């Protein structure tokens, strides 16, 4: 909508109308459910909506090797004016699209390559990276896709110039280990602010991430802060914990058995579980061309359906994995929204338990009992519907075929991580993980080689942490040590050779970064730094901490803070 106080020439007004018409026409071809820019003036619109045909043309022209570059570009003036100008110029002889972009946008700066001081140990390198990866965005440009946050925060690194939801918890583990409790508190405050502002924590603090969330680790973040601040942290963030829970459970009251609404599903027996969901069904701005190509490769499916499933996989954090596909070699067979993920439901169980604890800390016994009952119901649903009795591991539920899926993934360890697994089942999961996923360099994400980054042979720091902690929770200390030791050795060998930590690792050996996926391997790297530092302190005694991974395997892991076990673990 053009502000009334701005006076423009008749010609320019006509051009703007043309531009807007083109924008609406462009997006009608992608989805009828795309957000209406005028429906909520408080919610900033992503660049694909702000710029319409210009955004589409720039991305399709592949002006930049990484599609995220233009998604992060900042318009130098009102996008409507730029769009109108583009509509007038683009058919003129000699029009240069790249020149037009350079004149009208500020492109993101290439990250300065961090050169660490020579001779640093692994610990020294990580401690030195915290200030390098710290950002502050209290004030941003008016049309920037970056969303402002009140406090400073730590980014993952590389192409990821913003904060990411689930990444941040594992980064915060390292910050706490380094004694940076002020930064931990700042990041929890930022996520609380986002919940208050948007009703949920978006995938990242970009406008184009607002339509989805990510694995809900906010409860873990608050629990981490409570280790330092006590129950005051639980009481302070109880309202935000409740709001996040409301976001994930929106629409549950009206669901009939067999129905789904956004992020919540009700199975035929009345069990309530959750799935990943994105509110939009258009190509992702940060992967525009790739998503369009994926949809075109499978003309038998509606493009909007594929776009939604791609976006929902991004919400899962596992973008992409054979876990979500019918054919692991064909991304267009992805159907994330028809799969009930075991890890998501384990995390929501943890959220319910944290809500119960926070309510009790606030003196509300009735609410504490209410959330405990919800957690118990979810735990029963996990045991009933997300356990593959034939294979002997936790797995995802297939809504389309109304049955448990057979694939073993590292997500099977999440019920152990949140203490929601039965003891006998935890032992079976440990045996399965050791037999099928444990590799020389750590725990593989799956056993499938699809070329996607959340598949074999890649291993990711957060999944190593979840597995090791979950196994320890159930007395599977030897397997937990193997996961920890092998992954740390992989990180150390890679660091020794390249003097950096990376986003993911090839766990089929040691000393090699991972591959696959939509973009090159990224350096930094927030969650790897955090998990590595935490694991270093677990394999070395407190009285004699180690700065690098020891050359010989320790006998056992150091003790970690005890989590309250659920009834299932007794």
Swiss-Prot record:
Signal sequence residues: 1-34
Q: Name one GO molecular function term.
A: alpha,alpha-trehalase activity
- What are the boundaries of the region Disordered? 544-570
GO aspect biological process, one term = cellular hyperosmotic response
Q: Where does this protein reside within or beyond the cell?
A: Periplasm
Q: What is its main location?
A: periplasm
Q: Does the keyword Hydrolase apply?
A: yes
Q: Which residues are the active-site ones?
A: 319 (proton donor/acceptor), 503 (proton donor/acceptor)
> Which UniProt keywords are listed?
Glycosidase, Hydrolase, Periplasm, Signal
Quaternary structure, per UniProt, is: Monomer.
Q: Which family does it belong to?
A: Belongs to the glycosyl hydrolase 37 family.
The protein's name in its UniProt record: Periplasmic trehalase
Q: Which species does this protein come from?
A: Salmonella paratyphi B (strain ATCC BAA-1250 / SPB7)
Gene of this entry = treA
């Amino acid at each position: 909508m053009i502000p009334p106080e701005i006076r423009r020439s008749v010609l320019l007004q006509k051009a703007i109308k043309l531009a807007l018409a083109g924008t609406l026409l462009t997006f009608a071809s992608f989805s009828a459910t795309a957000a209406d820019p005028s429906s909520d003036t408080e919610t900033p619109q992503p660049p694909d909506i702000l710029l319409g045909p210009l955004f589409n043309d720039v991305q399709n022209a592949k002006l930049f090797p990484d599609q995220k570059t233009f998604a992060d570009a900042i318009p130098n003036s009102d996008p409507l004016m730029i769009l109108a100008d583009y509509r007038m110029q683009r058919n003129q002889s000699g029009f240069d699209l790249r020149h037009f972009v350079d004149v009208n946008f500020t492109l993101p700066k290439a990250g300065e390559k961090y050169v660490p001081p020579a001779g640093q140990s692994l610990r020294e390198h990580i401690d030195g990276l915290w200030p390098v990866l710290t950002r502050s965005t209290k004030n941003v440009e008016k049309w920037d896709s970056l969303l402002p946050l009140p406090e400073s925060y730590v980014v993952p690194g590389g192409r990821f110039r913003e904060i990411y939801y689930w990444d941040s918890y594992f980064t915060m583990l390292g910050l706490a280990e380094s004694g940076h409790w002020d930064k931990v508190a700042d990041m929890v405050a930022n996520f609380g602010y986002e919940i208050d502002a948007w009703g949920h924590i978006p995938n990242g603090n970009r406008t184009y991430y607002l339509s989805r969330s990510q694995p809900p680790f906010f409860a873990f973040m608050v629990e981490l802060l409570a280790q330092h601040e006590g129950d005051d942290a639980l009481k302070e963030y109880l309202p935000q914990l409740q709001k996040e829970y409301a976001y994930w459970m929106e629409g549950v009251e009206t669901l009939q058995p067999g129905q789904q609404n956004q992020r919540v599903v009700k199975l035929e027996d009345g069990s309530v579980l959750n799935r990943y969901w994105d509110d939009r069904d258009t190509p992702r701005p940060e992967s525009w061309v790739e998503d369009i190509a994926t949809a075109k490769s499978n003309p038998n499916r509606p493009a909007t359906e594929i776009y939604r499933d791609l976006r929902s996989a991004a919400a899962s954090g596992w973008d992409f994995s054979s876990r979500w596909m019918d054919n692991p070699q064909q991304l267009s067979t992805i159907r994330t929204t028809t799969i009930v993920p075991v890890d998501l439901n384990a995390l929501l169980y943890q959220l319910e338990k944290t809500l119960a604890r926070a309510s009790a800390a606030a003196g509300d016994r009735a609410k504490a009992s209410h959330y405990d009952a919800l957690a118990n119901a979810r735990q029963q649903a996990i045991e009933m519907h997300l356990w593959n009795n034939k294979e002997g591991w936790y797995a995802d539920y297939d809504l389309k075929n109304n049955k448990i899926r057979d694939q073993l993934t590292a997500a099977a360890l999440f019920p152990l991580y949140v203490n929601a697994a039965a003891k006998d089942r935890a032992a079976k999961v440990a045996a399965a993980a050791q037999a099928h996923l444990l590799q020389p360099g750590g725990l593989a994400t799956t056993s499938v080689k699809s070329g996607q980054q959340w598949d074999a042979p890649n291993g990711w720091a957060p999944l190593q942490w979840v597995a090791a902690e979950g196994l320890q929770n159930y007395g599977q200390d030897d397997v937990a040590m193997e996961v920890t030791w092998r992954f740390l050795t992989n990180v150390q060998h890679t660091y020794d050779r390249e003097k950096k930590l990376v986003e993911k690792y090839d766990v089929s050996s040691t000393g090699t970064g991972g591959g696959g996926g939509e973009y090159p391997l990224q350096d930094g790297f927030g969650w790897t730094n955090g998990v590595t530092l935490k694991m270093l302190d677990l394999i070395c005694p407190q009285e004699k901490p180690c700065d690098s991974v020891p050359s010989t395997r320790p006998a056992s892991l150091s003790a970690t803070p005890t989590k309250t076990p659920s009834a299932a673990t007794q």
